[in-house]
């Protein structure tokens, strides 16, 4: 392949197409997105914090192979690496990048779903990192998984997941989404809800370890364990949300104006996130995630929802007011003016009203 540039990311070096020669990354013969470095770094930390060695790791949509190579070089837990791409040019580049990093891997030139079905019951980790939606590959990912393991998926079709394209959202994820101020969380839980339903169909129970939003994508990593009876537990965390005048109502059946089906259970595990923050970068971001995951209630709030006289409290003030009122509250990574609170909308609103009334009485 012509027009390659040598790049470095994390602890590896690799060749990727020179975007200047191809008019951008989306026109290059093999896709590599430097904006996903944080995604790859956090996922590498997660594998390391997961704490199990000798893992069989499969990345069926490998592109340049950088994600899988980073897993092998940096995590210290990969026993066998399986890389694949349907593009012959990508496969050639993957082999080149494996060689310069001294990494061994099985490399395939297959349709991703064909490979995943061939790998039935043989993988500890399956990481779906497509250009667009992971939905077409989730069934195959569970088929390739052993009795237990990790399922990771990236979705860049965020506009679909948040309901901007209702028909496509219904076709692709089987969900109906209504716009809300916390639409980012709805989109993330939409993706998780889809993965949970597919998991149940494949007789797996899932436990999210890390789920987050970052600008142009959603990312989910979940522990999965096989067992038909336990798989039913997924549906204990599937529901609908209805938003009316600030109130977030969780419903167990669809009704007019509701969004769903969505995952309403935990978004992640604060313990594993804290482990990640101890061994790698992005500590501030991981701290926010760990705090968010410590609150079981879904749906974040936004400061303008509680504005009085055209003014909103600062985020720091809002968190302080709620904690003083006995309502645990933390920042959310999903909006700069957003916070999670372990309380219903009415309780949060009343706490702010008392604070505003008290402030006025002191003037």
Swiss-Prot record:
InterPro entries named among the record's database cross-references: SAM-dependent_MTases_sf, Trm1, TRM1_arc_bac, tRNA_met_Trm1_C
GO molecular function, one term: tRNA (guanine(26)-N2)-dimethyltransferase activity
Listed EC numbers: 2.1.1.216
SUPFAM superfamilies per UniProt: S-adenosyl-L-methionine-dependent methyltransferases
Binding site for S-adenosyl-L-methionine: 40, 67, 85, 111-112
Swiss-Prot/TrEMBL catalytic activity: guanosine(26) in tRNA + 2 S-adenosyl-L-methionine = N(2)-dimethylguanosine(26) in tRNA + 2 S-adenosyl-L-homocysteine + 2 H(+)
PROSITE patterns linked to this entry: SAM_MT_TRM1
Superkingdom in the source lineage: Archaea
Keywords tagged on the record: Methyltransferase, RNA-binding, S-adenosyl-L-methionine, Transferase, tRNA processing, tRNA-binding
Keyword Zinc: no
Disulfide bond sites: none
GO biological process entries: tRNA N2-guanine methylation
UniProt xrefs under CDD domains: AdoMet_MTases
Top enzyme category: transferase
UniProt cross-references to Pfam families, sorted A to Z: TRM
Similarity comment: family membership: Belongs to the class I-like SAM-binding methyltransferase superfamily. Trm1 family.
Name assigned to this protein: tRNA (guanine(26)-N(2))-dimethyltransferase
Species for this entry: Pyrobaculum aerophilum (strain ATCC 51768 / DSM 7523 / JCM 9630 / CIP 104966 / NBRC 100827 / IM2)
Lineage summary: Archaea, Thermoproteota, Thermoprotei, Thermoproteales, Thermoproteaceae
